[in-house]
C-alpha cells in the first residue's frame, strides 16, 4: 500500500487478523461451492470490518486505519482506472470487435488442427484489447468455440485455447486489473512511488512471449494428435470485418503505455480513437454510448461504469482489511518469521513470493482479482525488505496469480467457460476435468515464471537499478 506512515497503532492481533481471515475464509468457501458474487463479498468484507470494530480495544486507531486505507492512493488509483477501463472495454465491444475476430478466423480457412492456435491468438488479442479475462471467455465461448467445433477442432483443446488467450491478455494488457494491481501495489524502497504499469508489462514480456510461443507449438502438436470433433457447416461465422478496426485503439493504448505516457492519458486516447472509428465507420452511434429514454439511461458508457462499480468497492474493502494487518504489526511478525528462513538470499525471497502467490491463487481461484489484492501487500513488504525491484515483484505476482482460475475445476474462469459452451448450443459434452491440462499457456507461464526466479537481470534489485523507470 502506498502509505509512508507504517507506524503500529496498538491494534490487537485478533482485531487485525480476524476480519481479514473471515473474509478470505468466506471467499475460499464460496469458491469451492461456485457461489462467488462480488456484491456478496463486499457485504462479507463490511461485516468482517464491523466485527473487528466491536472486538478491538483501540477503537480510534482501528477506524482511523480503516478509513485511511479505504481512501489510500492504491485504492483510488485502481478505482479510477477500472472505471475508465469499463467504459473503454464496452466501447470496443459495441464496435463489434468480437465479430471482426471471428470473421478473420473464418477467412483464414484454418484446418481443424490449427484452429486452436488461431483461437488462442485471437482470444489473446481480444483480452489484450479489453483487459478482461472474463469478458474474453464469455465472448469467445459463444463465437469462436462453435466455429471451431464446426471445422472439427477438438473440444477440450478449443476450450483450453480460449482460456489460454484470456490468460495471456490478463497478464500484459495495460488495462487489465491484474496488471494494474500488480504494478500499483509494489512500492520502491523509498515508499514515494510505485511501479508504473507500462514498465512492469515491458519487464515481463520476455517471459510472456516465451510461454506464448511454446503454447502455439503445444496447441499445433496436440491438434494433430488428439481426436477431432465431426466437422459441420456453421451459420455462426460472422461477415462483419469492420470490427477489426477496433484493434487500432488497443495498439495505441499499448504503445503509449510502453512509452511511459500516463495510463489515464493512454486510455483516454484509446477511447477517443475508438469513438471516432466507430462513429465514422457506422459501427455504432452516439446513442449507443449514452442513451436517454424517459427516466432510463443506458449505453456502453453507463454499462461500463456499472460493471466496474462493485469490484471497485470490493477493492477498497480488501485494502482496508490488509491495512489492519500492516498497522497492527502482524505483517512485521510474519515477515520476521519468513526472514529467519530466507535470511539474505534474494532467490529464496523470490521463491517465497512465488509460493505465497501460488497458494493465494489456488485458495481464491474464483476471482483472481481478489487473490491478487489479498496477497499484494505481503509481496510488497517482502520485496522491499530484500530490495527486490518492483518490476520483478510485479512480474511474479501477475504471472503466478492468474494461473489457477484458468485450470482448476472450481476456478471462476473455468466455470464461466463451461456456462458459455452450454449457452453456445454446440452440443458438446465437456467437463472441467477434461480441460485441466489443455490450457497450455497458464501452465507454461507458471514454469517460465519459476525459472525466472533463478535468472538475474538488471531489474533484479533496486541497488543495481536506481534509474527512474
Where are these regions (language model features)?
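Juxtamembrane helix-boundary/capping and inter-helix hinge elements in multi-pass membrane proteins
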Residues: 58-59, 71-75, 152-156, 181-201, ...
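Membrane-interfacial loop-to-helix junctions in multi-pass transporters
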Residues: 72-78, 103-121, 149-158, 239-248, ...
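Hydrophobic mid-bilayer segments of alpha-helices in multi-pass membrane transport proteins
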Residues: 13-26, 36-57, 78-85, 117, ...
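Short helix-coil transition sites and intra-membrane helix breaks within transmembrane domains
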Residues: 76-77, 89-99, 126-139, 167-177, ...
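Hydrophobic alpha-helical transmembrane segments of multi-pass integral membrane proteins
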Residues: 79-87, 111-143, 338-380, 397
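Juxtamembrane and boundary regions of transmembrane helices in multi-pass small-molecule transporters
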Residues: 164-167, 171-236, 406-469
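Core transmembrane alpha-helical segments of multi-pass membrane transporters/permeases
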Residues: 42, 63-99, 292-332, 351-354, ...
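Alpha-helical transmembrane segments of multi-pass membrane proteins
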Residues: 113-126, 152-169, 348-361, 386-406, ...
Amino acid at each position: 500500500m502506498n502509505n509512508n506512515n507504517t507506524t503500529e497503532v496498538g491494534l490487537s492481533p485478533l482485531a487485525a487478523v480476524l476480519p481479514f481471515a473471515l473474509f478470505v475464509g468466506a471467499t475460499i468457501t464460496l469458491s469451492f461451492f461456485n457461489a462467488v458474487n462480488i456484491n456478496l463479498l463486499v457485504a462479507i468484507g463490511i461485516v468482517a470490518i464491523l466485527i473487528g470494530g466491536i472486538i478491538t480495544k483501540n477503537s480510534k486507531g482501528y477506524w482511523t486505519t480503516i478509513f485511511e486505507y479505504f481512501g489510500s492512493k492504491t485504492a483510488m488509483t485502481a478505482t479510477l482506472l477500472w472505471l475508465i477501463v469499463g467504459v473503454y472495454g464496452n466501447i470496443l465491444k459495441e464496435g463489434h470487435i468480437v465479430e471482426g475476430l471471428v470473421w478473420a478466423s473464418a477467412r483464414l480457412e484454418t484446418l481443424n488442427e490449427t484452429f486452436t492456435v488461431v483461437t488462442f491468438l485471437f482470444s489473446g488479442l481480444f483480452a489484450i484489447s479489453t483487459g478482461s479475462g472474463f469478458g474474453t471467455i464469455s465472448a469467445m465461448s459463444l463465437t469462436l468455440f462453435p466455429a471451431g467445433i464446426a471445422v472439427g477442432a477438438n473440444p477440450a483443446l478449443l476450450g483450453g485455447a480460449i482460456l489460454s488467450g484470456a490468460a495471456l491478455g490478463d497478464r500484459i494488457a495495460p488495462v487489465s486489473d491484474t496488471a494494474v494491481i500488480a504494478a500499483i501495489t509494489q512500492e520502491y524502497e523509498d515508499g514515494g512511488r510505485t511501479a508504473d504499469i507500462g514498465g512492469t508489462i515491458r519487464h515481463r514480456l520476455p517471459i510472456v512471449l516465451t510461454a506464448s510461443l511454446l503454447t502455439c507449438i503445444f496447441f499445433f502438436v496436440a491438434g494433430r494428435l488428439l481426436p477431432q470433433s465431426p466437422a459441420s457447416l456453421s451459420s455462426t461465422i460472422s461477415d462483419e470485418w469492420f470490427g477489426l478496426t477496433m484493434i487500432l485503439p488497443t495498439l495505441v493504448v499499448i504503445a503509449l503505455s510502453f512509452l511511459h505516457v500516463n495510463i489515464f492519458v493512454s486510455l483516454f486516447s484509446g477511447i477517443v480513437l475508438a469513438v471516432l472509428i466507430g462513429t465514422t465507420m457506422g459501427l455504432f452511434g452516439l446513442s449507443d454510448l449514452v442513451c436517454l429514454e424517459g427516466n432510463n439511461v443506458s449505453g456502453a458508457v453507463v454499462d461500463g461504469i456499472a460493471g466496474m462499480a462493485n469490484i471497485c468497492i470490493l477493492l477498497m474493502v480488501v485494502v482496508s482489511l490488509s491495512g489492519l494487518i500492516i498497522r497492527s504489526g502482524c505483517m512485521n511478525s510474519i515477515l520476521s518469521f519468513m526472514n529467519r528462513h530466507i535470511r539474505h538470499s534474494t532467490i529464496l525471497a523470490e521463491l517465497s513470493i512465488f509460493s505465497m502467490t501460488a497458494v493465494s491463487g489456488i485458495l481464491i481461484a474464483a476471482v483472481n482479482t481478489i487473490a491478487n489484492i489479498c496477497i499484494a501487500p505481503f509481496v510488497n513488504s517482502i520485496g522491499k525488505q530484500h530490495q527486490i525491484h518492483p518490476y520483478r515483484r510485479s512480474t511474479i505476482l501477475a504471472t503466478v496469480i492468474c494461473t489457477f482460475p484458468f485450470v482448476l475445476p472450481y476456478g471462476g474462469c473455468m466455470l464461466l467457460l463451461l456456462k458459455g459452451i452450454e449457452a453456445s448450443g454446440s452440443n458438446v459434452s465437456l467437463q472441467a476435468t477434461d480441460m485441466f491440462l489443455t490450457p497450455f499457456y497458464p501452465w507454461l507461464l507458471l514454469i517460465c515464471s519459476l525459472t525466472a526466479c533463478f535468472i538475474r537481470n538488471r531489474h533484479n534489485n533496486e541497488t543495481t537499478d536506481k534509474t527512474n523507470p
